[in-house]
From Swiss-Prot:
<dbReference type="InterPro" id="IPR019462">
    <property type="entry name" value="DNA-dir_RNA_pol_bsu_external_1"/>
</dbReference>
<keyword id="KW-0548">Nucleotidyltransferase</keyword>
<keyword id="KW-0804">Transcription</keyword>
<dbReference type="InterPro" id="IPR007641">
    <property type="entry name" value="RNA_pol_Rpb2_7"/>
</dbReference>
<keyword id="KW-0808">Transferase</keyword>
<dbReference type="InterPro" id="IPR007120">
    <property type="entry name" value="DNA-dir_RNAP_su2_dom"/>
</dbReference>
<feature type="region of interest" description="Disordered">
    <location>
        <begin position="1155"/>
        <end position="1183"/>
    </location>
</feature>
<dbReference type="Pfam" id="PF04565">
    <property type="entry name" value="RNA_pol_Rpb2_3"/>
</dbReference>
<comment type="function">
    <text>DNA-dependent RNA polymerase catalyzes the transcription of DNA into RNA using the four ribonucleoside triphosphates as substrates.</text>
</comment>
<dbReference type="GO" id="GO:0003899">
    <property type="term" value="F:DNA-directed RNA polymerase activity"/>
</dbReference>
<protein>
    <recommendedName>
        <fullName>DNA-directed RNA polymerase subunit beta</fullName>
        <ecNumber>2.7.7.6</ecNumber>
    </recommendedName>
</protein>
<dbReference type="InterPro" id="IPR007642">
    <property type="entry name" value="RNA_pol_Rpb2_2"/>
</dbReference>
<dbReference type="InterPro" id="IPR010243">
    <property type="entry name" value="RNA_pol_bsu_bac"/>
</dbReference>
<dbReference type="InterPro" id="IPR014724">
    <property type="entry name" value="RNA_pol_RPB2_OB-fold"/>
</dbReference>
<comment type="subunit">
    <text>The RNAP catalytic core consists of 2 alpha, 1 beta, 1 beta' and 1 omega subunit. When a sigma factor is associated with the core the holoenzyme is formed, which can initiate transcription.</text>
</comment>
<dbReference type="InterPro" id="IPR037033">
    <property type="entry name" value="DNA-dir_RNAP_su2_hyb_sf"/>
</dbReference>
<dbReference type="InterPro" id="IPR037034">
    <property type="entry name" value="RNA_pol_Rpb2_2_sf"/>
</dbReference>
């Protein structure tokens, strides 16, 4: 028997077919969100306040400092926030110090800086009552990048770009005449030497001494018309500020503010790290021949002679000397912008492959401290030097799609950037107020205006492209959404501009980003998912874990190192499935491994690292597909994406054939209830679980506090499905920390359960499964196998209008008593009432405009008092196609002191309607291998084909859907699933390390089935056996969110577009069916003239005709002839607006009068057509 039993959680054992032992536990799958937010609260906020303080006034007398901050208690807890449509947030209070330097007076005060949204334990935010997720953004890391490009003559040219976190870009490029230019902040280009002169290298000779003599530099100096620092500064000023009179002082301050002012230019710590790494000498000296000796300046010892070729070993030897102080030059510059000497490190080497033996200078930036967040003149000089080195064939260009050059901005950093914007706006206000107000009586509270800060945070959570409404279709969708990486958004790419290369899978994605899970369509490759073991380091680069190989003994150790993409480039990594002996030596002489982008075989003693797990390549959702290794990648992509669209079923069931990931994904998704402390279950109810903590001290156990966990019961999720939690522990159970106490939606016994295990046969049946259609047994409808619960929310507000307040009431004009049967005395529907489309949920009347009364009416009014109120019915009704049972009603009143209502709203009523949807013809189903189809027929159980023991099968799939799509995984799942069912076990087949063919066949034989997995089937209608044996087995099938009930739509009359008077389109607008150009041709081809006429007139935009037609149908008369369609009039008006005189003639060349339709003409025949089901915002005009 292959495989061994493994326990997943408390309740589930699976036979696991993995051969590779797990060295590393899966990390917490949502830590990318929670860790980043914790960093923001602990360090990010402090960093912000440090950056901005002190704020000084223009005279430098007053100074405002931010000392410390604290977060208070949230106003509402999580549940309350969701119910009240409030934001789950805590007040941020900042301790501020105002110092008056003249008088020496110091004032401390705590200032409220607005409510700050808090992250929930599950990595989401509750904003205005809705759960939202902040998606991490993939952006280019700030650094210096070198590119190679081929010009139109086929010559190699280079360009370089210095990209900061914020601030001006600096670009170098060459042209056809071998002149090197620089661009500052995307302006017109200048010769590169102009910038060098401006930095203080004023003479030609000092520039040549600095960069080394070469033809590119000579050409550039010839092109350069400036001769000293002053001229260079004026030249730059004229380029950056054309039209302004240049002065040397202005030019200096401009250049300083562009690059050397920490408030305007910021590399961030990651930029400094990347910059120092790129401009380090070691990468350029590798394999180069020295043209001067390298001397240890402390001892005077020569560590490398002139003429030495620096291979890896020699470089490692001299590394310490290089990094301490070798060859560091300190240039004291005259008239420099930055008043510090420029420290650089320079070494001369011979130009490679040069017969004349010319030399070039390699300059490094002498590694500035990591605290230096600005660019330094040394950085600029070293970047220029790297550029000249590239022109001589020294150094490497950068690949922008490499994950060493792309980093993640997670929640914390995105929030910090947004907060910084708010604080800098606030800073301006503070400065202005400092200069206006009286310095003696002023307090910090009076200076600070928190509006810009609150506004920028609100704007980020409410409308940023990266703050998204959480996809809550099922727990897997929720988990994947939190682990999503997007290259779009502010500061990122746009769909239209993104090239093929950005979207492509790159070798550096291995173990960091999933190569499979990405959307189909315009976002392909721009939105990705984090791999299962990946984590994000302090600089925002994605790291993946590897097992270290001990180089002395050549054994694979259990030491785990996390490597970023550019660190990994220096090592050879063996695959996770390389075979090892008991000591951890590689068994084969040659091992399959990866080095940079190449997959090769190498000697086993060359290995540096080994993968920790075969599933480290793929994301959490992809790792849930069994037999992934037997599926084509395109279908696997669909499989991974469609699992996220599975609807939570009423009776979920975890798969017989899983991958062992079901428990981890369910636990970390946020849908389950997780135990926080080791303890004993004391009390279990359907809506709460109580756990008594157990504290261990000196080997003794004591009872601690009692924790209460509330369960969500039949709540509405973001996607309108039912969110319900069920306990899976019982009284007296001892539960460990992190254990699942209650299942969420789409979970069973602590495992993800998106669908059901059903018996499937691959066979055709009267052509009903043509084109991937699915034939289903009626048993699945009868036994509620694929029944799901859906909850819709409807709300009605009573507002104050100009004519008086709206009122929620049972007293509605012109409505029959029968229509009010479900309303209580307040005019609100009862809980438990069954409603269908058009029924009133909340009775509401709105005051109409009061008309001027006649003298008689005024007299009657004076005698009899109140005249009958003029109100119109604006009740909330059930929209078309909806309906169900009223699950809950929530009423919020302003009188009850409900301050969460928006201004102008007196009362808010929310009604929740629940529907139990059985599966229908037209619903979409799928497996986990991208095999999707629509149900075409539901066959009575007795007519379904049956197995030899009389069991009817549940679903028939078309066998033609398998070969061309190459997703063979579904066939293996089918056979193994049948064996698991017969043996009464659950199995796990992990991706890339699962059951192989022999395992599947041996398990089939163990279950007493035929070795080929096929069986004789009998036709349920005739009882005859089918000609050939058929593959029958158990497959895990999901019901997808694309349900026919949501798509079916019909219209009789409804809203019309204002200009063309044609019906609107789409279900949401209650629109009509488009009869387009080609459909017109079809009717013309049939000669169906009258049918075509009524489609183009009454049923479309003949405004008068359609009203008369309606009237005629109601009265039972004949329908009159149509008049002119409105769109024809629109065309005429368009032509007339161009100044053309347009007339319409009949066949006798007589002019036809085109009278404008008068409102009264239409109103005369007006028929009141009920259109309550159209939302106010979508009503344009109605007949």
């Amino acid at each position: 028997m292959a495989g061994k039993f493994v326990q997943y959680g408390r309740h589930r054992k699976r036979r696991n077919y993995a051969r590779i032992s797990e060295v590393l536990e899966l990390p917490n799958l949502i830590e990318i969100q929670t860790k980043s937010y914790d960093w923001f609260l602990k360090e990010g906020l402090l960093e912000m306040f440090r950056d901005i303080s002190p704020i000084e006034d223009f005279t430098g007398n007053l100074s405002l400092e931010f000392v410390d901050y604290r977060l208070g208690e949230p106003k509402y807890d999580l549940e309350e926030s969701k119910n009240r449509d409030a934001t789950y947030a805590a007040p941020l209070r900042v301790k501020v110090r105002l110092i008056n330097k003249e008088t020496g007076e110091v004032k401390d005060q705590e200032v409220f800086m607005g409510d700050f949204p808090l992250m929930t334990d599950t990595g989401t935010f509750v904003i205005n009552g809705a759960e939202r997720v902040i998606v991490s953004q993939l952006v280019r890391s700030p650094s210096v990048y070198f590119n190679e490009k081929i010009d139109k003559n086929g010559r190699e040219n280079y360009d370089a770009t210095v990209i900061p976190n914020r601030g001006a870009w600096l670009e170098f490029e060459t042209d056809a005449k071998d002149i090197v230019y620089v661009r500052i902040d995307r302006t017109r280009k200048l010769p590169l030497t102009v910038l060098l002169r401006a930095l203080g290298y004023s003479t030609d000779q000092s520039i040549i001494d600095l960069l080394g003599d070469n033809e590119y530099l000579r050409n550039t100096l010839e092109k350069d018309s400036t001769e000293n620092t002053e001229q260079a500064l004026l030249e730059i000023y004229e380029r950056l500020r054309p039209g302004e009179p240049p002065t040397v002082e202005n030019a200096k301050s401009l250049l300083y503010s562009r690059f050397f002012d920490p408030k305007r230019y910021d590399l961030a710590s990651v930029g400094r790290y990347k910059m120092n790494k790129k401009l380090h000498l070691k990468h350029r000296l590798f394999n180069q021949k020295l043209a001067e000796p390298i001397v240890n300046s402390d001892t005077g010892e020569i560590v490398a002679e002139e003429g030495t070729v620096l291979d890896r070993r020699k470089l490692d030897e001299i590394m310490d000397v290089l990094e301490s102080n070798a060859n560091i030059e300190v240039d004291e510059l005259d008239d420099s912008i930055v008043n510090e000497p420029v420290e650089i490190q320079s070494i001369k080497v011979y130009v490679p492959n040069d017969e004349e033996g010319r030399t070039t200078t390699v300059i490094g930036n002498a590694f500035p401290d990591s605290e230096v967040k600005c660019i330094t003149p040394a950085d600029i000089v070293a970047s220029m030097s790297y550029f000249f080195n590239l022109l001589h064939g020294i150094g490497q260009t950068d690949d922008i799609d490499h994950l060493g050059n792309r980093r993640l901005r997670s929640v914390g950093e995105l929030l910090q950037n947004q907060f910084r914007i708010g604080l800098s706006r606030m800073e301006r206000v503070v400065r202005e107020r400092m200069s206006i107000q009286d310095t003696d009586s002023i307090t910090p509270q009076q200076l600070i205006n928190i509006r810009p800060v609150i506004a920028s945070i609100k704007e980020f959570f409410g409308s940023s492209q990266l703050s998204q409404f959480m996809d809550q279709a099922n727990p897997l969708a929720e988990l994947t959404h939190k682990r999503r990486l997007s290259a779009l958004g502010p500061g990122g790419l746009t769909r239209e501009r993104a090239q093929m290369e950005v979207r492509d899978v790159h070798y550096s994605h291995y173990g960091r980003m999933c190569p499979i899970e990405t959307p189909e369509g315009p976002n392909i490759g721009l939105i990705n998912s984090l791999s299962s073991y990946a984590r994000v380091n302090e600089f925002g680069f994605i790291e993946t874990p590897y097992r270290k190989v001990d180089l002395e003994t050549n054994t694979v150790t259990d030491q785990i190192d996390y490597l970023t993409a550019d660190e990994e480039d220096s090592y050879v990594v063996a695959q996770a499935n390389s075979r090892l002996d008991d000591e951890g030596h590689f068994i084969s002489e040659e091992v399959v491994c990866r080095f940079r982008g190449n997959n090769t075989m190498m000697d086993r003693d060359k290995m540096d690292y080994m993968d920790v797990s075969p599933k480290q390549v793929v994301s959490a959702a992809t790792a849930c597909i069994p037999f992934l290794e037997n599926d084509d990648s395109n279908r696997a992509l669909m499989g991974a994406n469609m699992q996220r669209q599975a609807v939570p079923l009423m009776n979920p069931e975890s798969p017989f054939v899983g991958t062992g990931m079901e428990h981890a994904t369910a636990r970390d998704s946020g849908a389950a209830v997780i135990n926080k402390h080791f303890g004993r279950v004391e009390h279990v109810e359907s809506n709460e679980i109580k756990v008594r903590r157990i504290i261990e001290e000196d080997g003794q156990q004591y009872d601690g506090e009692l924790d209460t966990y509330r369960l969500a019961k039949f709540k509405r999720s973001n996607s309108g499905t039912c969110y319900n939690q069920r306990p899976i522990v019982k009284d007296g159970d001892i539960v460990s920390q992190g254990e699942i106490l209650a299942d969420g939606p789409s979970m069973e016994l602590g495992e993800m359960a998106l669908g059901r295990n059903v018996v499937v046969g691959f066979m055709t049946w009267d052509g009903y499964n043509y084109e991937d259609a699915v034939i289903m047994s009626e048993r699945l409808v009868k036994d509620d196998v694929y029944t799901s619960i859906h909850i819709e929310e409807y709300e009605s507000e009573a507002r104050d209008t100009k004519l008086g307040p709206e009122e929620i009431t049972r007293d509605i004009p012109n409505v029959a008593e029968s229509a009010l049967k479900n309303l209580d005395e307040r005019g609100i529907v009862y809980v438990g009432a069954e409603v269908k489309d058009g029924d009133i949920l909340v009775g509401k009347v709105t005051p109409k405009g009061v008309t001027e009364l006649t003298a008689e009416e005024r007299l009657l009014h004076a005698i009899f008092g109140e005249k009958a109120r003029e109100v119109r019915d604006t009740s909330l009704r059930v929209p078309h196609g909806a309906g169900g049972i009223v699950l809950d009603v929530k009423v919020f009143n302003r009188e009850d002191g409900d301050d969460s209502l928006s201004p102008g709203v007196n009362q808010l009523v929310r009604v929740y309607i629940v529907q139990k949807r059985k599966i229908h013809v037209g619903d979409k189903m799928c497996g986990r291998h991208g095999n999707k189809g629509v149900i075409s027929k539901i066959v009575p159980e007795e007519d379904m084909p049956y197995l030899p023991d009389g069991t009817p099968i549940d679903i028939m799939l078309n066998p033609l859907g398998v070969p061309s799509r190459m997703n063979i995984g579904q066939v293996l799942e089918l056979h193994l699933g049948m064996a698991a069912k017969n043996l009464g076990i659950h199995v796990a087949s992990p991706v890339f390390d699962g059951a192989n063919d022999d395992d599947v066949w041996s398990t089939i034989e163990e279950a007493g089935m035929a070795r080929d997995g096929k069986t004789v089937l009998y036709d349920g209608r005739t009882g005859e056996p089918f000609d050939n044996r058929i593959s029958v087995g158990v497959m895990y099938m999901l019901k997808l969110a694309h349900m026919v009930d949501d798509k079916l739509h019909a219209r009789s009359t409804g809203p019309y577009s204002l200009v063309t008077q044609q019906p609107l389109g789409g279900k949401a607008q209650f629109g009509g069916q488009r009869f387009g150009e080609m459909e017109v041709w079809a009717l013309e081809a049939y000669g169906a003239a009258y049918t075509l006429q009524e489609i183009l007139t009454y049923k479309s935009d003949d405004t008068v005709g359609r009203v008369k037609t309606y009237e005629a149908i109601v009265k039972g008369e004949n329908i009159s002839k149509p008049s002119v369609p409105e769109s024809f009039r629109v065309l005429m008006k368009e032509l007339q607006s161009l100044g053309l005189d347009v007339k319409v003639m009949d066949e006798d060349d007589k002019e036809i009068e085109m009278a404008d339709v008068d409102e009264d003409d239409v109103n005369e025949h007006k028929v009141n057509i009920q259109q309550s089901s159209i939302p106010e915002s979508q009503k344009e005009t109605t007949d």
